[in-house]
Structure formats: C-alpha cells, structure tokens
Amino acid sequence: MKIAIVTPAAARVRNGNRNTAERWATFLRQQGHRVCVQVEWDGRCADLMLALHARRSHASIKRFFECCPQTPLVVVLTGTDLYRDIRNNYSAQESMRLATRLVVLQEMGLNELALDLRAKTHVIYQSARSIKPVAPLKKLFEVCVIGNLREEKDPFRCALAAALLPKSSKIHIHHMGAAVNDVMARQALVLMERIPRYRWIGESPHWQVRKRLARSRIMVISSYMEGGANVVSEALSAGVSVIASDVSGNIGMLGADYAGYYPCGNEYALAEMLYHAETNPEFYDLLKKQCAQRKEYVQPQLESAKLAQLIAAVTGQTISSPSVPIPWPRPGKAV
C-alpha cells in the first residue's frame, strides 16, 4: 500500500509529532508499505492517509477527503487536540468527523471523546528502544527535564521547585529542549542566574538526550497538557523514575495508581516530592518499581503490532507485524 503520513512538523524540527511520524513510517515500511512523510499532503494518490494533529493538519485532511472520499483516513489526536482544540475549534472537530479512524496515544485520551468517536478510536502507546544503563553521578542527585520551552509544557516549574529545596539537597536540574521564542530563552537564562541548581542545556542531539536521561535519577514532566509524551516512554524504557504533573495524558501513560504525581502548576508540591525521592529510599524504590511495571506498554514490537492492526482495521486486510527484532529510526534531535 501507498501511505501518506502528514505531520505539521517539518523534517528539521524534532518534536514529538515528527518523531512519531518518522517512527511509524519505519514500522510501516518494515510491514511492506510505501510511505511518504509530508508536512502538507502533496495531492498524489495514496491508499491511506495518516494525519497527526487534527487542527494543524486540517487542510490536508479535508483536501484528501474531498479528493479521495472512499479512501481510509486516520487522524492521530495530539495533546493540544485532545485537551483544548476539540472543544472549541471547528477545524479539529471537522477533522475528527471526516476520519475513518482516530488514534489516541494513551488510554485516558478516550475519556475526552464523545461516545460515537470512541467507537472508531484506537489506542497506540508510543514506544522507545532500550537504553544502555549509565551510572548516575555520585556527587549530584541529577534530575532531567526533556522538552522544548513551550507554554503547554510549563517548562520552568521544575526550576521554580529547585529554588525551594533545602541547602542540604544535592538535586540539580538539567533541562534539554529548544526555546520556541526569545522570551522563553531569556526567561531560562534569568532562572539559571538566579537558581544555581537549574541549568538549561538547550536543544541537543538525540543520543545526548538519551545518555543524560539514562544517568538521571528522576525525569520530571510538568506539562499542562500531554497527548501521550514519548519522553515518558523513553524514561520507562531506560528504567528512570518519573515525577509527573497530574494531568490526564500523564496518568494515561503511568497509570492511575502511580505514586509520582504532583498537582499541576504547583512548584511547592513538586519540590516536596523531589526532595522526598532524594531522601526516602522506600519512596524512590516504589517509583522505580511502578515504572518498571509500565515498561511493557512502550515496547517497539507492541507499537508496531498495534499499527498493523489499525491498518488492517481500516483496509479490511490482514497484516502481520514482523517477527524479527525491529531496527529503530534515529532522529537527529529529540526534544
């Protein structure tokens, strides 16, 4: 089959949507399909379209539907789709109506959809390849934050929490991710000057991000909204404990009973939990154990199989996932 994958993120941009598109393209090619990843649909015939982001890919979705009304059309709902745009944005709402099937990236996403839309929705957890263990730093309790400096990510909550830690704490925050504008960059620089425990590293090659993640004691994801963050998948794969804002997308990734949630936007609660993880081995071990139990959700073989099931469902074909180990696409940047 010829499959067009549309993502609003250009090839030079290494955000979650682009990484998902490239990873899925690799899986689909391994399953025997011809795949083209595009920012906008180029008008060429395809047997199926996979569009990431209901609102931002709406123009491509609508044109494809009008040109190929009998051809399967799959729309993948992102965090801003699920937790903002589908409530009041006509383009996002129309994209969902036009879709043959919808995809959410964690199970809690289903709760945001009307019953008629849930009936045509698949859940596909994003996967991450295994990371070779790296010994943690001995003199520091290293905490990493991975994500671009965007408002939806609440990017500086961890820095603000670091400022509240007692002097005895060895916690240091290392933040990897590009600033989306000069205002965010200046704010990060100001916080670095003011808070010695916080260091903004900026955008980094994917291998460096993974190496620093693997040696970290904790990864913090502080977002106001998440569709199903791939950085959580990376942390689970690496065996790194997560402290997360208590938003639906994070709960869908880590489970309702996970012990590492803090009230979103509350740096005081985050600081308390970070210090508790640093100083209480039983709590830290609990987080490790619970994260290990979620690792099965983010295996490449499972994501590939779920993707094959989706294609089969919309085309009426039977497609088998490869039984051999799956090689992994290697993005240049991943933040």
Q: Language-model features: where?
A:
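A charged, aromatic-enriched C-terminal amphipathic alpha-helix characteristic of glycosyltransferases
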Residues: N15-G16, P133, E282-A312, G316
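Short alpha-helical donor nucleotide-sugar binding micro-motif in glycosyltransferases
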Residues: M96, E203-S204, K211-S216
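Conserved donor-binding/catalytic core segment of Leloir-type glycosyltransferases
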Residues: A135-L165, I173-M176
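Nucleotide-activated donor-binding/catalytic signature segment of Leloir-type glycosyltransferases, i.e.
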Residues: R186-W207
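Aromatic "clamp/platform" in nucleotide-sugar-dependent glycosyltransferases that forms part
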Residues: Y224-M225
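Short hydrophobic beta-strand element within catalytic cores of glycosyltransferases
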Residues: S241-A244
